[in-house]
Amino acid sequence: MAQHTPATSRAGTFGAILRVTSGNFLEQFDFFLFGFYATYIARTFFPAESEFASLMLTFAVFGSGFLMRPVGAIVLGAYIDRIGRRKGLMVTLAIMGCGTLLIALVPGYQTIGLAAPALVLLGRLLQGFSAGVELGGVSVYLSEIATPGNKGFYTSWQSASQQVAIVVAALIGYSLNITLGHDAISEWGWRIPFFIGCMIIPLIFVLRRSLQETEAFLQRKHRPDTREIFATIAKNWRIITAGTLLVAMTTTTFYFITVYTPTYGRTVLNLSARDSLIVTMLVGVSNFIWLPIGGAISDRIGRRAVLMGITLLALITTWPVMQWLTAAPDFTRMTLVLLWFSFFFGMYNGAMVAALTEVMPVYVRTVGFSLAFSLATAIFGGLTPAISTALVKLTGDKSSPGWWLMCAALCGLAATAMLFVRLSRGYIAAENKA
């Protein structure tokens, strides 16, 4: 049977990568749409006395989905580590699809009152619950089918697939801006991309049904029960904590340059919606290019060199470039600054994903990776739009989101030093055998 055949043949490698990353595409497609259409969603579901209050409520609901990620990481991650990568990834896709359908179909506040924002919140919670293990499950799968010496390159396609989703979503949004008027988009047009997302769910189910189990999982003789999984996670809390800080840099930068960029460009820098979409498309293409490069370079010179080099560069340059952007904001400056941040994200994340799979205990690799990633996304990435909006409002400084990006870079630098010191001293290897 297909599900018991190890996914190791060269001929099937590309197909395996495509099938396993298809769910990543859907997840990021929906998340980007929520960020880009935040102002329209705010008016539809969260009417308030001021645009700022309405937008903050929307971003709070957006962030709530990330708070469910750690729960999904633990529950679904333990399930995947116990029963297999293939079956677990099918379950996450089903839950994600339910959340997507709910957001696309729920009527507005004017039609059903408080039930509208409540249902949107439920949809985001379902998406967050499934997404809590989606990245981890995909990353672990890719790391386990990778050929020797190419783990960084293979795992980089987890994030690269998300960039395709960003470009596709931005292209759809750009097309709608050209063909529909502002009023039409505000009233009903913003739902069209969400319906498109619903339409591709059956295709992704077909792709994932033919996914083969990894040889590494099939060869495991021991299948830990839930108690063993939780005990191992508790024993390795230091690795989980360091992993969370390691992910902070990538998740904060990513959600700033993709999800928050359209809102930042329109409401803070006063650029047009079309300009913001074009910049976002360019960022998606740039991310797609730099991610596999970062992963491949880390395979050659080591994860630590890439991670520390990029975090130091981010700490040195983030504030000056944000000041330069906001001094005279225009399309060219915004493009250059975000492409610079895209370089940070792609290179760092390309190395980081492989590093995180390598330091996690083998029997809880999915739940450990997913928990660290989910905590970082909930604390840092998911709250980036709300924190950035609040910083600009409270300080009156349009470049103030740069401080948040620098904070995340500092976390990444500290985590890299912490993990690789422990790795060099043999602590992590010993813990992984426990």
Swiss-Prot record:
User: Which keywords does the record carry?
Assistant: Cell inner membrane, Cell membrane, Citrate utilization, Membrane, Symport, Transmembrane, Transmembrane helix, Transport
* Signal among keywords: no
* Residues annotated as transmembrane: 22-42, 55-75, 88-108, 112-132, 165-185, 187-207, 239-259, 277-297, 305-325, 336-356, 367-387, 401-421
Q: A single Pfam family, by name?
A: MFS_1
Mention any additional remark: Allows the utilization of citrate as a sole source of carbon and energy.
Q: Which NCBIfam families match?
A: 2A0106, PRK15075.1
Instruction: Return the SUPFAM superfamilies for the record.
Output: MFS general substrate transporter (SSF103473)
Which GO terms of the cellular component aspect does the record hold? Answer: plasma membrane
Kindly list the biological process annotations in GO that this record carries. Answer: citrate metabolic process
Q: Name one GO molecular function term.
A: symporter activity
**Full protein name:** Citrate-proton symporter
Its annotated function is as follows: Uptake of citrate across the boundary membrane with the concomitant transport of protons into the cell (symport system).
The annotated topology with respect to the bilayer is: Multi-pass membrane protein
The source organism is Salmonella typhi
Give the matching PROSITE patterns. MFS, SUGAR_TRANSPORT_1, SUGAR_TRANSPORT_2
As for family, the record states: Belongs to the major facilitator superfamily. Metabolite:H+ Symporter (MHS) family (TC 2.A.1.6) family.
- Name the source's superkingdom: Bacteria
Localization recorded for this chain is: Cell inner membrane
Q: Which residues lie on this side of the membrane: Cytoplasmic?
A: 1-21, 76-87, 133-164, 208-238, 298-304, 357-366, 422-434
Ranges per topology, Periplasmic: 43-54, 109-111, 186, 260-276, 326-335, 388-400
